[in-house]
């Protein structure tokens, strides 16, 4: 039984889930909004919020931490160019999830996650 186990498993192994989160975060940073399933959007939201909170203080340590999560120098640079200026005075709530309805092929609930 999974009593008292926090976090979404999304039917994937730890490594697969970590890669999924990394790819979703990179896509969100590069495109500002992405369309994905509601479960994936809800699972990646705390990860990207924490990453933006780290990026608000532009220090070498913060850059190393962000690079370890993202593994993409281009996405890390882009994050550190807009995060301190855009979210400098904002304490959390950097993303918004909007429900889009079911997907045509399999009926999965779709959502739009975007940076505010």
Swiss-Prot record:
Keyword annotations: Ribonucleoprotein, Ribosomal protein
Native source species: Chloroflexus aggregans (strain MD-66 / DSM 9485)
Entry's Gene Ontology molecular function annotations: structural constituent of ribosome
Pfam families listed in its UniProt record: Ribosomal_L17
Entry's family note: Belongs to the bacterial ribosomal protein bL17 family.
Underlying gene: rplQ
Database matches in NCBIfam families: L17 (TIGR00059)
Superkingdom assignment: Bacteria
Annotated protein name in UniProt: Large ribosomal subunit protein bL17
Biological processes per GO annotation: translation
Disulfide bond annotation, renumbered to this chain: none
Quaternary structure and interacting proteins, as annotated: Part of the 50S ribosomal subunit. Contacts protein L32.
InterPro entries: Ribosomal_bL17, Ribosomal_bL17_sf
HAMAP family in the record: Ribosomal_bL17
Gene Ontology cellular-component annotations: cytosolic large ribosomal subunit
């Amino acid at each position: 039984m999974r009593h008292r186990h926090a976090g979404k498993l999304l039917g994937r192994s730890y490594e697969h889930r970590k890669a999924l989160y990394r790819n979703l975060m990179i896509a969100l940073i590069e495109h500002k909004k992405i369309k994905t399933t509601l479960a994936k959007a809800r699972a990646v939201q705390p990860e990207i919020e924490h990453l933006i909170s780290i990026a608000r203080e532009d220090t070498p340590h913060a850059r190393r931490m962000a690079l370890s999560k993202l593994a993409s120098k281009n996405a890390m640079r882009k994050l550190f160019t807009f995060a301190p200026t855009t979210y400098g005075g904002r304490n959390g709530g950097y993303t918004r999830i909007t429900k889009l309805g079911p997907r045509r092929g399999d009926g999965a609930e779709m959502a739009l996650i975007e940076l505010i």
